[in-house]
Curated annotation (Swiss-Prot):
<dbReference type="InterPro" id="IPR044855">
    <property type="entry name" value="CoA-Trfase_III_dom3_sf"/>
</dbReference>
<comment type="function">
    <text>Involved in the 3-hydroxypropionate cycle used for autotrophic carbon dioxide fixation. Catalyzes the transfer of CoA moiety from succinyl-CoA to L-malate to yield L-malyl-CoA. It is highly specific for succinyl-CoA as the CoA donor, however it can accept L-citramalate instead of L-malate as the CoA acceptor.</text>
</comment>
<comment type="similarity">
    <text>Belongs to the CoA-transferase III family.</text>
</comment>
<dbReference type="GO" id="GO:0047370">
    <property type="term" value="F:succinate-citramalate CoA-transferase activity"/>
</dbReference>
<dbReference type="Pfam" id="PF02515">
    <property type="entry name" value="CoA_transf_3"/>
</dbReference>
<dbReference type="InterPro" id="IPR050509">
    <property type="entry name" value="CoA-transferase_III"/>
</dbReference>
<comment type="subunit">
    <text>Forms a large complex composed of six heterodimers (alpha, beta).</text>
</comment>
<feature type="active site" description="Nucleophile">
    <location>
        <position position="175"/>
    </location>
</feature>
<dbReference type="InterPro" id="IPR023606">
    <property type="entry name" value="CoA-Trfase_III_dom_1_sf"/>
</dbReference>
<dbReference type="InterPro" id="IPR003673">
    <property type="entry name" value="CoA-Trfase_fam_III"/>
</dbReference>
<protein>
    <recommendedName>
        <fullName>Succinyl-CoA--L-malate CoA-transferase beta subunit</fullName>
        <ecNumber>2.8.3.22</ecNumber>
    </recommendedName>
</protein>
<dbReference type="GO" id="GO:0008410">
    <property type="term" value="F:CoA-transferase activity"/>
</dbReference>
<keyword id="KW-0120">Carbon dioxide fixation</keyword>
<keyword id="KW-0808">Transferase</keyword>
<dbReference type="GO" id="GO:0043427">
    <property type="term" value="P:carbon fixation by 3-hydroxypropionate cycle"/>
</dbReference>
Length: 405
C-alpha cells in the first residue's frame, strides 16, 4: 500500500497528519479522500486521543476513529525524542503538507517550528489549527469546539428565548468547520506553490471558523448596535413561518416560507388559500408583525396531521418542508440511498461491515473514495520508514529499542 492512487486529483501529494482529534485531522481526511497519501503520525503510547472517543470496537479503538481516520497510514513517532524529531524532519523533506494542532509554541519547543521545517522543505504547506490562532492575547488558551461555539457567538443564539443557551446541533461542529476552512487553505496554498514554487503556513482558529458563518450579525451590530437573541425553534426576523412544528404523531417538520409566493403555497397546502390574500397574511411584513398568530395557525394545522400527511401536502404544493430526521430516519430515506450518502466498508479485522458517511463533494470526473478504515496504531510504521526514508530493519529496530517508534 502506498496510500495514493493516480486516478484521483490529489494523487502524488503527501500529507503528514501530526494532529489529534478532529479539526486538523479532518482536513487531512478530506485530502486523503481525493488521493493524497496521508501519514498519520502518532505518539507510540496511546496514539491519537480520537482512538478513544465514541463507541468502542473489538479492536480496541472506536467507530469514530474507524470512520474519521479513513485513508490514512499510521506511523508511530515520539516527536519529543531527538531521534523522533530527526525522523520527522526527514519525512517533512519528502512531504507536501503538514497538519498540526498543538498549542502555539509546542512544535517550536521541540525544534519543529515553521522556521525550521520551512528551511528543510521550502515547498512545505503547514496547516496550524488552534482554538484562538497563533497570535493575539488568547493564543495560549486551550480551545475545543464547545469553547469555539461560545467565543464565536453561535452558542449564544442556540436555545429558547431567554432560556439556557444549548449546544448548536453538534458538539464538534467547530472542528469540522475549521477542518473545511483548513482544507480550502491547503488547496489554495498548493495552487500558489504551483505558481511560485514556495510553500506557506495557514493559521486557522476554531472560533474564527464559527464567527465567519454569522450572516449579518456583524454589519447589523456595527451599524445599529443590534444584538440578535435566541429565537428557539422559530426564527422570524426575515421570514414567517420559518421554524419547526410538531405533528400529530409526535414528530417534527421544518417549514420555511421566505417569500410571499411560498406562503401562498403553504396556505393552499393547509386548505386555507385566503390566508395568503393581501388583506390577511399575504405580505411578509404583515406576517412578521403577527408572527405569533401565523405560527399558531401553522402549528395547529401540523398538530392535526401526521408528519407524513403534512409533508405530503407540502410537497404537493411545492412548499419548502422537510422532516427533522434522526439518524434512523436518514438511514431509511430513499433520497439518501439514491445519492449514495451512506457507504458500507468491510472491517475485516472486526468481521463486520461498517456504514459511514460517503465522500462529498461529488466530482463528475475524479470522485473521491474510501480505500481503508482508520488504521491500527503503528500499522504502517515499518512500511513508511522503508518506503519513504529507505531505512533497513536494523535502523528501525534501533528506533524501536529507544522507544522512538
Amino acid at each position: 500500500m502506498d496510500g495514493t492512487t493516480t486516478t484521483l486529483p490529489l494523487a502524488g501529494i503527501r500529507v503528514i497528519d501530526a494532529a489529534t482529534v478532529i479539526a486538523a485531522p479532518f482536513c487531512a481526511t478530506l485530502l486523503g479522500e481525493f488521493g493524497a497519501d496521508v501519514l498519520k503520525v502518532e505518539h507510540p503510547i496511546g496514539g491519537d486521543a480520537l482512538r478513544r472517543f465514541g463507541t468502542p470496537t473489538a479492536r480496541g479503538d472506536t467507530l469514530t476513529w474507524l470512520s474519521e481516520s479513513r485513508n490514512k497510514r499510521s506511523v508511530t513517532l515520539n516527536l519529543q525524542h531527538p531521534e523522533g524529531a530527526r525522523v520527522f524532519k526527514e519525512l517533512i523533506a519528502h512531504s507536501d503538507v503538514l497538519c498540526e494542532n498543538f498549542r502555539p509554541g509546542t512544535l517550536e519547543k521541540w525544534g519543529l517550528g515553521w522556521d525550521v521545517l520551512s528551511k528543510i522543505n521550502p515547498r512545505l504547506i503547514m496547516l496550524r489549527v488552534t482554538g484562538y490562532g497563533q497570535t493575539g492575547p488568547y493564543r495560549d488558551r486551550p480551545g475545543f469546539a464547545r469553547i469555539a461555539h461560545a467565543v464565536g457567538g453561535i452558542a449564544y443564539l442556540a436555545g429558547m428565548p431567554k432560556g439556557t443557551p444549548v449546544t448548536p446541533g453538534s458538539t464538534t461542529l467547530a472542528d469540522y468547520m475549521t477542518g473545511l476552512y483548513g482544507c480550502i487553505g491547503v488547496l489554495l496554498a498548493l495552487r500558489h506553490r504551483e505558481q511560485t514554487g514556495r510553500g506557506q503556513y495557514i493559521d486557522a482558529a476554531l472560533y474564527e471558523s464559527v464567527f465567519r458563518c454569522s450572516d449579518e450579525l456583524v454589519p447589523a451590530y456595527g451599524m445599529y448596535r443590534k444584538v440578535r437573541e435566541r429565537h428557539g425553534s422559530h426564527y422570524n426576523e426575515f421570514a414567517c413561518p420559518h421554524g419547526h412544528f410538531q405533528t400529530k404523531d409526535g414528530k417534527w417538520v421544518a417549514i420555511s416560507c421566505a417569500t410571499d409566493k411560498l406562503f401562498a403555497r403553504l396556505a393552499n397546502a393547509m386548505g386555507r388559500p385566503e390566508l395568503a390574500s393581501s388583506s390577511v397574511y399575504g405580505d411578509q411584513k404583515v406576517r412578521l408583525a403577527h408572527a405569533s398568530d401565523v405560527n399558531e395557525i401553522v402549528r395547529d394545522w401540523c398538530s392535526s396531521l401526521t408528519r407524513a400527511e403534512v409533508l405530503e401536502r407540502c410537497y404537493a404544493t411545492a412548499t419548502p418542508a422537510a422532516p427533522l430526521n434522526d439518524i434512523a430516519d436518514f438511514f431509511g430515506d430513499r433520497h439518501v440511498h439514491a445519492r449514495r450518502n451512506l457507504v458500507a466498508i468491510d472491517a475485516e479485522d472486526l468481521g463486520e461491515t461498517l456504514i459511514m458517511p460517503n465522500v462529498v463533494p461529488k466530482l463528475s470526473e475524479t470522485p473521491g473514495s474510501i480505500r481503508s478504515l482508520g488504521p491500527k496504531l503503528g500499522e504502517h510504521t515499518e512500511e513508511v520508514l522503508k518506503e519513504i526514508l529507505g531505512m533497513c530493519d536494523e535502523q528501525i529496530n534501533d528506533l524501536r529499542s529507544k522507544r522512538v517508534i
